[in-house]
A protein has these predicted regions:
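Bacterial N-terminal signal peptides
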Residues: 7-19
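Positively charged n-region of N-terminal signal peptides that target proteins for export
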Residues: 1-4
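Extracytoplasmic/periplasmic ligand-capture domains
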Residues: 26, 69-70, 85, 93, ...
Length: 597
């Protein structure tokens, strides 16, 4: 979820150009069957924020770039761009050629005409990120650096509207198929953002035909991608069908950077026109057990194995014999994501920056048993988190040592020191001024969340802290979180790009209401973050990251929990599947053979 939410999140669909002659187009008699654990929010690339919406967006829309399907470490390749970006002026200017001959899916908004993709579509789409009505999460990527943007943003925020026709010096179409993006300072690694689905192209005609009061188009997605939306029952089912206007793209042959096993994955598929399967049928199945049962009965072609059910399926890193006998395989890696709990620093009970408030948050953090959560709730399908940046991303420091971890004795001593004591003898502490102290943790309604609630209750009881739980579905809790209405909540962020700088944007004050759920306001942290954005990956930037890590532990806006494994179970009839750390659900590359009856 967006944050998984999600950070946000890449969710791009990679492409390959060239290769063997095209054999045949999508087989409309074939259906790929998939399940999501959480309901989607909507399918507007610039307005979406949760992982599950972006999975669908990745099938319908196109960013300029993608990742080579097979190469590891990941490598950028052109998608709708004609070539990799020309980067000049010491990383300040990106010039990109859009490939001619790419068309949007047919839609009444185009009034019967074929609509070609142009550089202006990317200019318009990126401008939507800056529209205050859209309330896009992604403005922080540009704010303070894109040439001319800060003045435009200030004017738009004051007026409440955005002038899409006004000149923006840092974002221009030089001609019909040439896009130029200019920054005030070097923007190292920006090319990876150009492979993110939030930077996909939408057509202005579609937005103006279907937009809501927020200038969002969540329900009428029209893109240039491999699929188009056929049917949507919100929170229950999403049906996609192959886009007949999709350009000539074929399944790639493994090349440089591919694994030895990739030849077998591509066998019989290389050179075939994408997408391979004509239909994608997505069900929303929130509970873990029914999802696994659907997979076991052959109703799903692949499924992300819920950690709570890992003992039923896995023996270490391999599937158990009964699954192996059926031909089921597991694809496994540590995801570029972090699970955490946050405190709302605006909340009168747990928020604030005074010593006693910081002490309360630190004590709660030291009292939550992450090890038990990983062992008993996640059944070992995660590793402890030491810093916001997950392993395998640029910026993760394996030498960084967390200042504190699970230590209930130290937590109780800290609470005692700052006056959190049980004054009425009921077994629970009060605030230093004697007023009641009750922690309220937001929590979803599924069985996994209930098990975590029980762990939280045991841990807080051991500290003498009363805790209750606010139960609701994820989309509703997310809205409340954005509005600053929750005291505490647990989330995950998954990376859109292979660079870790983004993980510190979740603590920057200007991102309150979008990325910064903790609503932290520390000018010193903001300054370190802005300084880090001007540096390439290397020791100097890592030193700044470690300073920010120390501040995060010092003020305790988050309880850093874990970096989860992703275990994807695949049926023997699913072909062409290759796991990617930054791209999930690359449906156009998947094929299904006839299922056994």
């Amino acid at each position: 979820m967006r944050r998984w939410s999600v950070h946000l999140c890449a969710f791009v669909v990679a492409t390959a150009l060239g290769g063997a002659p095209v054999v045949r187009a999508a087989d409309m008699t074939k259906t790929l069957r998939v399940a999501f654990s959480t309901a989607e929010n909507g399918f507007d690339p610039q307005a979406a924020y949760d992982s599950y919406s972006f999975y669908v967006i990745g099938g319908i829309f196109d960013p300029l770039y993608a990742y080579d399907y097979f190469a590891r470490p990941v490598r950028l390749v052109p998608n709708t761009a004609a070539a990799l970006p020309e980067v000049t002026d010491q990383g300040r200017t990106y010039t990109i050629k859009v490939r001619p001959g790419i068309y949007f899916a047919a839609d009444p908004a185009f009034k019967g005409k074929r609509r070609e993709l142009t550089a202006l579509d990317y200019v318009y789409s990126l401008k939507r990120i800056f529209d205050p009505k859209v309330r896009s999460y992604w403005v922080y990527i540009f704010e303070g650096n894109l040439v001319g943007l800060d003045e435009v943003l200030a004017s738009a925020r004051k007026a409440g509207t955005f002038d899409y026709d006004a000149e923006l010096a840092g974002l221009r179409a030089l001609d019909r198929f040439t896009l130029q993006i200019r920054f005030r300072r070097p923007n190292f690694g920006f090319e990876y953002w150009l492979a993110s689905n939030q930077f996909s192209a939408v057509a202005r005609e579609v937005v103006e035909a279907y937009r809501d009061s927020s200038n969002r188009v969540m329900e009428n997605p029209v893109g240039t991608g491999a699929y188009k939306l056929k049917q949507w029952t919100r929170g229950q089912r999403i049906l996609l069908e192959a886009n007949p206007d999709y350009r000539e793209v074929v399944y790639p042959s493994p090349g440089a950077g591919s694994d030895a096993a990739d030849a077998a994955i591509a066998r019989g598929l290389a050179g075939r026109k994408l997408p391979l399967v004509g239909n994608v049928d997505i069900s929303i199945i929130e509970e873990a057990q029914p999802r696994l049962l659907s997979f076991d009965s052959g109703q799903l072609d692949y499924v992300a194995l819920p950690a709570a059910l890992a003992p039923n399926v896995l023996d270490g890193a391999a599937v158990k014999p009964e699954y192996a006998k059926r031909g089921v395989v597991v694809h496994r890696h540590v995801t570029p994501s972090i699970a955490f709990f946050y405190f709302n620093l605006d909340h009168p009970l747990v928020g604030g920056y005074t010593p006693e408030k910081v002490a309360l948050r630190r004590a709660v953090s030291m009292g939550y048993d992450r090890g038990e959560a990983i062992s008993n709730l996640l059944h070992g399908q995660a590793i402890p988190a030491s810093q916001p940046v997950p392993p395998a991303l640029y910026g993760h420091d394996p030498k960084y040592v967390a200042p504190y971890g699970y230590d209930p004795r130290a937590a109780r001593a800290l609470l005692d020191k700052f006056g959190y004591k049980d004054r009425d003898g009921d077994g629970y502490r009060e605030l230093p001024d004697g007023k009641p102290l009750t922690l309220v943790l937001a929590s979803t309604t599924d069985n996994t969340a209930r098990a975590n609630d029980e762990l939280w209750k045991r841990c807080m009881d051991a500290l003498g802290l009363r805790i209750t739980f606010l139960k609701n579905k994820w989309p509703e809790l997310n809205k409340m979180s954005e509005a600053g209405q929750l005291m505490m909540w647990g989330l995950s962020w998954i990376s859109s790009v292979p660079d870790g700088n983004d993980y510190y944007s979740y603590f920057v004050s200007r991102n309150i209401g979008t990325l910064n759920d903790a609503r932290m306001r520390l000018p010193a942290f903001d300054a370190l973050y802005d300084k880090s954005r001007d540096l390439p990956h290397g020791p100097a930037r890592t030193k700044l990251f470690d300073e920010m890590n120390d501040m995060i532990y010092g003020y305790a806006p988050w309880i850093l929990a874990n970096y989860p494994y992703e275990n994807v179970l695949a049926q023997p009839w699913l072909k062409g599947y290759k796991q990617n750390p930054f791209v999930q659900h690359q449906w156009r590359y998947y094929d299904v053979e006839p299922r056994p009856h």
